[in-house]
Curated annotation (Swiss-Prot):
GO terms for cellular component: cytosol. It comes from Campylobacter jejuni subsp. jejuni serotype O:23/36 (strain 81-176). Its cofactor is Zn(2+). Gene3D superfamilies: Cysteine-tRNA ligase, C-terminal anti-codon recognition domain, HUPs. This is Cysteine--tRNA ligase.
Length: 462
């Protein structure tokens, strides 16, 4: 696999068997938006590709569960820190399951690594990288000769993103420990960690060595990832990661989607209108490094492309596909899956991979038209679809449930009742009533398909 490193702007070959990946996760003070979803889905695809080709992957995605935004939420809501963070961690994980994002091997929470953070600050203090102000302990960026080597920018370009509310030695200096009487007792003074320190301590505790891949949104490159790299370089005496990957923004009306800009489109809102697999397909439909503007029509088109996958699956009577063995050894046998893996090995070229998937579905349907009773052909296509589902992370649902998605329990009961009435009318040769029921259901965007095994129904989405 070759991946474009955000730092060197060059494709770096990843030819190890064992791969370590750390993905910066959410700050858990509110529901997750599509920007969070895109980061998780893009790097879940990376993980799936590595697993599918036999790599052993150690994957961590953290939770920032102590932060100024969470404290503000505490003040507004009257809830405790634990009540807020537990609620939104559960909410986030529900969203990830809906998007078929594999559960990480490690899900560290910042509050569980306070001792590790303090140990890191001690190392930095011992070597003269810190100083103390009235509100906390700061990292002196002027002492790090390689500071800004990650983002490769002049500091002047980034000043607008930095806070200088206190008299720091340098505008780029950042807080390691914030004094706060309400939190952790230690030799530096009661307080809580700075955001940039949290990730370094968690990475050091879990992985101990230089990461193969550090991933996150492009907005984290500076200052967050720059400051992480500085602490690891100066405190742990090693490079934090060999490859840095950053996904592009999700935009709404040309603006970056952000909770702070109050233009977030929450995952839960999207899931009310579209199933998780359709949303996943949409979020994967452009290259992970590119920005894309949220568009309802593009999301609808992604759903139509996914429909074609399920139409072929339904034609083969292929039921629910298990996602379980993707985390174990899965053997890729089909030629199409091997071709798609080869494409995705080039910096996750997902647009090209999905185009090849579209071509495969069209070709498979043509072959089935010619040889509808060829059992070997059907079995080969079934195996290919199963392998492709595990690589892309969609296509697992039972086809009947897929095409009935979005119908409430009450609506389902009414539909089934009308189908029984129609079946009885047909038995009694009352075709006018049978046709009237079909038209009644069609007006409610329900289409009927009469088969040798009875009548089945689907929801019409267009």
């Amino acid at each position: 696999m070759r991946l474009l490193d955000s730092v060197t702007k060059e494709k770096i070959k990843l030819d190890k068997k064992d791969i370590s990946i750390y993905l910066c996760g959410p700050t858990v003070y509110d529901d997750a938006h599509l920007g969070h979803a895109r980061s998780s889905v893009c790097f879940d695809l990376l993980r799936r590709v590595l697993l599918a080709q036999g790599n052993r992957v150690k994957f961590a995605r953290n939770y920032t569960d102590i932060d100024d935004k969470i404290l503000k939420k505490m003040t507004q809501s009257g809830q405790t820190l634990e009540e807020i963070t537990e609620f939104y961690i559960k909410s986030y994980e529900e969203d990830m399951r809906a998007l078929n994002v594999l559960d990480p091997d490690f899900k560290p929470r910042a509050t569980h690594y306070i001792t590790a953070m303090l140990d890191l600050i001690k190392k930095l203090a011992k070597d003269g990288f810190v100083y103390t102000l009235e509100d906390g302990i700061y990292f002196d960026t002027s002492k790090d000769e390689k500071y800004l080597s990650l983002s490769n920018r002049n500091l002047e370009e980034n000043i607008s993103r930095l806070s200088n509310e206190v008299q720091k030695r340098n505008e780029s200096d950042f807080v390691l420990w914030k004094f706060d009487e309400n939190f952790y007792e230690n030799e530096f003074g009661k307080g809580r960690p700075g955001w940039h320190t949290e990730c370094v301590a968690m990475i050091d505790s879990i992985f101990e060595n230089t990461l193969d891949i550090h991933a996150g949104g492009i907005d984290l490159l500076f200052p967050h990832h720059e400051n992480e790299a500085a602490q690891c370089r100066c405190g742990c005496k090693r490079k934090l990661a060999n490859i840095w990957l950053h996904n592009g923004f999700v935009k709404i009306d040309g603006e970056k989607m952000s909770k702070s800009l109050n233009n977030s489109f929450f995952i839960k809102d999207a899931l009310k209108e579209f199933m998780g697999e359709a949303l996943r397909f949409y979020l994967l439909s452009s290259h992970y490094r590119s920005h894309f503007n949220y568009s309802l029509s593009d999301l609808e088109n992604a759903k139509k492309r996914l429909d074609k996958f399920y139409r072929l699956k339904k034609r083969l009577d292929l039921g629910e596909i298990s996602d379980f063995d993707v985390l174990n050894d899965i053997e890729i046998k089909s030629e199409i899956a091997k071709q798609i893996l080869e494409i995705l090995n080039d910096d996750l070229n997902v647009s090209k991979a999905l185009a090849l998937l579209d071509d495969f579905i069209s070709s498979a349907n043509l072959e089935l038209d010619k040889e509808s009773k060829n059992k070997i052909l059907k079995q080969n296509i079934k195996e290919a679809l199963s392998e492709l589902a595990k690589i892309f992370g969609f296509g697992f649902m039972d086809t009947t449930l897929y095409f009935q998605w979005g119908v409430s329990k009450e609506e389902r009961e009414e539909i089934e009742k009308l189908i029984l009435e129609r079946t009885e009318a047909k038995k009694n040769k009352d075709f006018n009533t049978a046709d009237a029921i079909r038209e009644q259901l069609n007006s409610k965007k329900i289409t009927l398909l009469d088969t040798p095994n009875g009548t089945i129904w689907e929801k019409i989405n267009a």
